[in-house]
């Protein structure tokens, strides 16, 4: 091939490569704009403003998982009963399947914005409450629940009040969520709190005999312990306690443990 043909061939390849790069750039730009539109409510379902209440007939459950931005109230009663209140078009999309004794409060797959969803639950027994995201759960007035497990992943909040004869309380917080206790747990023996992130366990009123507190990150724990307090902190976490327990601590970082009463 002579020199002129080689030059023309090189120019063609260079122009074809530039054209391909432009096509890819345009495609990526369109994809980015489409994603932005989705996150900016372009493809999200919004509440229609038609507020209604509905009773749900569900299989029996003693474990509850909240996976949406909703307000949930859980109380104890002889018979199970569930009432939901909110935008009619949102309630229609609520999942109602119970699997292995657990009801996951979630909407069908999709994007949702600007809606109301309130759930009132009455159950005879409660073993586990989980929250993912920014929802709010209030648990009130339970008797004779030997073990209660609570977990938060995200920025949500779980509030507790009026528990009697609960022996063991396990709390798991991942993220910036809060567990707040407003009232004494009669007969509570053991407390196990594990915080990963900046979440808080704020429950001075909940008195316990023995507590294991593990914090990784900057979380805070406020508790009342009478006998043994085991502490593990990695980071800047803080533990403040009432009572006169024997304290065993292992701290890595700037974290601290302090008696405050």
Where are the predicted features?
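Short, Lys/Arg-enriched N-terminal segments with co-localized hydrophobic residues
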Residues: 1-17
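Short acidic/polar N-terminal linker immediately downstream of export determinants
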Residues: 6, 20-29, 36-91, 104, ...
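Short, linear, compositionally biased motifs with a strong N-terminal bias
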Residues: 13, 29-30
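A short, flexible low-complexity segment enriched in Lys/Arg and Gly/Pro that occurs
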Residues: 43, 215-216
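Short "repeat-start/strand-capping" segments in structured domains, especially the N-termini
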Residues: 56-64, 76-81, 98-100, 121-129, ...
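Glycan-recognition/cleft segments
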Residues: 93-97
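A general structural signal for short secondary-structure boundary/capping elements
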Residues: 111, 140, 165, 175, ...
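Periodic glycine anchor positions in long extracellular repeat architectures
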Residues: 133-135, 154-156, 175-177, 197-199, ...
């Amino acid at each position: 091939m002579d020199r002129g043909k080689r030059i023309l061939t090189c120019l063609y390849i260079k122009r074809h490569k530039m054209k391909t790069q432009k096509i890819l750039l345009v495609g990526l730009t369109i994809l980015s704009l489409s994603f932005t539109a989705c996150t900016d409510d372009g493809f999200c379902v919004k509440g229609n403003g038609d507020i209604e209440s509905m009773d749900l007939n569900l299989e029996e459950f003693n474990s509850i998982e909240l996976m949406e931005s909703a307000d949930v109230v859980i109380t104890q009663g002889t018979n199970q009963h569930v009432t939901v209140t909110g935008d009619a078009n949102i309630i229609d999309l609520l999942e109602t399947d119970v699997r292995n004794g657990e009801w996951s409060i979630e909407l069908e797959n999709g994007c949702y914005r600007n809606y109301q969803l309130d759930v009132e639950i009455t159950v005879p027994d409660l073993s586990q409450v989980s929250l993912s995201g920014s929802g709010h759960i209030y648990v009130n007035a339970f008797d004779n629940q030997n073990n209660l497990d609570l977990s938060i992943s995200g920025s949500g909040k779980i509030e507790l009040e009026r528990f009697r004869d609960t022996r063991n309380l396990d709390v798991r917080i991942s993220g910036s969520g809060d567990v707040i206790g407003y009232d004494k747990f009669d007969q509570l023996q053991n407390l196990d709190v594990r915080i990963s992130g900046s979440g808080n366990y704020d429950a001075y009123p909940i008195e316990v005999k023995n507590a294991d507190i593990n914090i990784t990150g900057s979380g805070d724990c406020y508790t009342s312990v009478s006998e043994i307090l085991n502490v593990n902190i990695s980071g800047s976490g803080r533990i403040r306690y009432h009572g006169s327990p024997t304290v065993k601590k292992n701290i890595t970082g700037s974290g601290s443990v302090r008696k405050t009463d």
